């Protein structure tokens, strides 16, 4: 584990273990992402977005990734942009974020 990264993340997310765990998992999963796909990112509305229904309704030739974290605030999302958005290099982004 990258201790420096964890400490910065812990500070940015105010020690919220659930949010820290999700972002750490995203960081790992990003190693397997195919660039140029679709990304949903933001707070709980994105985390809980019915992506499977979206896929069923539209025959999309792209993969959809979800980087939603319930309870994310704007400042927390901004602090995690590298792992929740930039690392995926998406072609299309849907973002919804709280306060």
Regions found by a protein language model. Name each.
Residues 71-72:
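Histidine-bearing beta->alpha loop at or near hydrolase active sites
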Residues 1-40, 46, 51-52, 56-60, ...:
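N-terminal secretory targeting modules
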Residues 47-55, 59-65, 75-99:
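Oxyanion-hole/transition-state-stabilizing segment in secreted/luminal serine hydrolases
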